[in-house]
């Protein structure tokens, strides 16, 4: 790889979408680049900047001499602490309001004698306004799609669904009349798909729906970037990656899983950076240490999934009645519009085998030998961490491309099983027992371990992702710096 001078380090500006599952992988990328000698400016929205101060402390935001944090407004009400939990409002607001303040920030950084010249901007794939800002200043712009490759490809086909007259649906009867079982046979590299396996944002009766329009347009706009990087590895999604390269762009770099690549970072100060927007409860790790290998059901719905109180109780009694130990993440805002309340008899039932906490260091949990299965919403961050940990999945997708990831986990990678949307406790008991006690579960676990080994091979020295990351730095970023 090309050498980097400490006197003239390349300067990368990183811009995540303001949600936990997007901030995490951008932070991992920032640490990887910082370890290679880059100066990093990490740009949060003001709302998330304040959340990081609450969860990590002011000293975290102060950063390091060569790893700095900045903030831009997202256009949402300053007084609403949970504003970024409503994804349509957040997406619409970032698209409309972030470009101008981001341009101002770049101008400020360019004028500052205290920071190196800007080499590149690496923005989240759904923060594509950064492409316009980069073009304004003549700066290299790289899009980081934090989805799976199959999720990215599905978003690129929103416009094709409209062209074929599939979307919009005439009314909401499509949700229950079998329409979602219609095959989708026109996406290259993604065979055996049905409409229900497509990202949930296609389920609209109006093509002007905020999220349908937002994801489709952001995906296509990202093709204008100088390069695209994905937190995946070739063998996991080879067919769809080949199709993306053939049809859209060859400047796509698979450089994951970051969670494993990050382990190779030398012991520098930025390696300890964690970007959780909630305070992480570390007591869960001691609790896991006392459990038998592969004995614990780990449950986490991600950072924005919300459920009803009725669903909360079905999950609670399903976990309790399975009789297996479980670690259950119950965010303070997980129940729509109210606090999560469970009956005293539930806590009495699970006191010796269940632990409920509000947030955990998930990467460490999924690497823990006590965890036997992960009940997940199938967000890509969680899915790739699960693959990296060699854990099978119980899939309960909520929205976005989680449905697509679920399809691949269950039918392609064969590491998962899917729960019904309208979950009942009896089904959860049955699925947990299947995954923890039967040959079906043992086979899913064997497959998960195989995928973990393949992921480790990809990021090892000489592996495909390792080499792709080197090539990305040398031929995309450093080549630009020397021009």
Swiss-Prot record:
Annotated residues for binding of UDP-alpha-D-glucose: 146, 360, 362, 377, 380-382, 385, 401-402
GO biological process assignments: defense response
Purpose: UDP-glucosyltransferase catalyzing in planta synthesis of cyanogenic glucosides. Able to glucosylate acetone cyanohydrin and 2-hydroxy-2-methylbutyronitrile, forming linamarin and lotaustralin. Also accepts, to some extent, a wide range of potential acceptor substrates, including simple alcohols, flavonoids, isoflavonoids and other hydroxynitriles such as p-hydroxymandelonitrile, mandelonitrile, (E)-4-hydroxy-2-methylbut-2-enenitrile and (E)- 2-(hydroxymethyl)but-2-enenitrile.
Keyword ATP-binding recorded: no
Pfam families with a match to the protein in the record: UDPGT
Tissue specificity note: Expressed in the cortex, xylem and phloem parenchyma, and in specific cells in the endodermis of the petiole of the first unfolded leaf.
Key word Glycosyltransferase present: yes
MF terms (GO), sorted A to Z: linamarin synthase activity
SUPFAM superfamilies: UDP-Glycosyltransferase/glycogen phosphorylase
E.C. designation(s): 2.4.1.63
InterPro entries, per database record: UDP_glucos_trans
Annotated family: Belongs to the UDP-glycosyltransferase family.
Protein name as it appears in the record: Linamarin synthase 1
Record: residues binding an anthocyanidin: 22, 400
UniProt catalytic activity: 2-hydroxy-2-methylpropanenitrile + UDP-alpha-D-glucose = linamarin + UDP + H(+)
Gene: UGT85K4
Residues of the active site: 22, 124
Coiled coil segments of this chain: none
